[in-house]
């Protein structure tokens, strides 16, 4: 009887304690969810700590009497059942807290791993900023490829291809062929053909330069003329655009005039003698074909030979004795 009474009293006190906790929780809905989540874990954590300190031997000793005594085992099961029944209100309390507005924090607790709090993230960011760009590792520049030294063994062109000694090769796309020797490439410049004088575009990508475009016109005094075109610059001057791009001009050959006072007319190349053939008698101009008395004692005339007037600028003059009055 005394043991039954004690058990009844214990059960009643446990029920009263659970009822009081529920009333306090319902009256105060602002209890942090973290404390509610940590509350059921504390007994288990203390048990694990005791178990780790006591060791597996102590746990076996505690479990053996419970298996040996059937009645005690049943009491333990009944007590554990009552403990589970007491935990049911805690789960209902969590659901009520989530429905009252604590869902966001509860979600944070489920997503965020233990120890990864906003304070820890802020400290990590501050530590990263404190390092600064000075201590940050800088990438090393890539090493340039260095061709090995093939002197005495071969020759290398611009692309890195190796040629054996005695082989002919072109060091580059615009280089002339070379002979690979033990001393290095031996290159001889061949005799290249001369470029056209009218070439205006030269290709130098090969060993010998080549003309890709020639000029087919001439420029003379601000005007453009086609190849082999003839043109007149003045009445006496004719020009021609040659194949080499140069302009050659010739002046018309005018016959020698039969006078000493020729006149140039517009649009005519050669001068003409408007006053006919004549010549100079000292400073005076006398007509040809007759004798002209320049003074009382001097007679002059222009020379005439073989039917043409001989070009003599000065007349032939003879002086006679004359009486003085």
Swiss-Prot record:
Keyword Transmembrane annotated: no
One Pfam family here: VWC2L_2nd
Signal sequence bounds: 1-27
Keywords (A to Z) from UniProt: Basement membrane, Extracellular matrix, Repeat, Secreted, Signal, Synapse
Residue interval(s) of motif Mediates cell adhesion: 114-116
Extent of Basic and acidic residues compositional bias: 44-56, 64-78
Chief location bin: secreted
Subunit structure: Peripherally associated with AMPAR complex. AMPAR complex consists of an inner core made of 4 pore-forming GluA/GRIA proteins (GRIA1, GRIA2, GRIA3 and GRIA4) and 4 major auxiliary subunits arranged in a twofold symmetry. One of the two pairs of distinct binding sites is occupied either by CNIH2, CNIH3 or CACNG2, CACNG3. The other harbors CACNG2, CACNG3, CACNG4, CACNG8 or GSG1L. This inner core of AMPAR complex is complemented by outer core constituents binding directly to the GluA/GRIA proteins at sites distinct from the interaction sites of the inner core constituents.
Task performed by this protein: BMP antagonist which may play a role in neural development. Promotes cell adhesion.
Name the record gives this protein: Brorin
